[in-house]
Curated annotation (Swiss-Prot):
Pfam families: DUF440
Family classification: Belongs to the putative dsDNA mimic protein family.
Role played: May act as a double-stranded DNA (dsDNA) mimic. Probably regulates the activity of a dsDNA-binding protein.
Organism the protein comes from: Histophilus somni (strain 2336) (Haemophilus somnus)
InterPro entries given in the database record: dsDNA_mimic_put, Put_dsDNA_mimic_sf
Organism classification: Bacteria, Pseudomonadati, Pseudomonadota, Gammaproteobacteria, Pasteurellales
Protein name (Swiss-Prot/TrEMBL): Putative double-stranded DNA mimic protein HSM_1473
Length: 107
């Protein structure tokens, strides 16, 4: 018998990622990036729910099942509405009772 995963809806995943971003950005981003984000987020900011990539093992050193996680990006979008300056990529577990997350910060 397999356990059914109740996946996060995109809005919930976005809210979780953005809350974590606001809490941890000061410790993980370059001060210049924080200033850039604060100045441009109102006009060009984006928090996007994207298809979960299968290359997270390279980023975090752990093999994951993309179906068990949501991926959210926080960054700035350009004139073509493409996110071209990504400040953080979040991998958030769909398991509500044991929510875990991983973050890859802009270097």
């Amino acid at each position: 018998m397999t356990d059914q995963i109740n996946k996060l809806d995109p809005d919930t995943a976005i809210d979780i990622a953005y809350d974590i971003f606001l809490e941890m950005a000061g410790e993980n981003l370059d001060p210049a990036d924080i200033i850039l984000f604060n100045l441009q987020f109102e006009d060009h900011g984006g928090v996007e729910f994207v298809e979960t990539a299968d290359d997270w093992e390279q980023e975090i050193g752990v093999l994951i099942d993309p179906d068990e996680y949501a991926e959210v990006w926080v960054g700035l979008v350009n004139e073509q509405d493409e996110m071209d300056d990504i400040f953080a990529k979040f991998l958030i577990s769909h398991k509500e009772e044991d929510r875990e997350y991983h973050v890859v910060w802009k270097k």
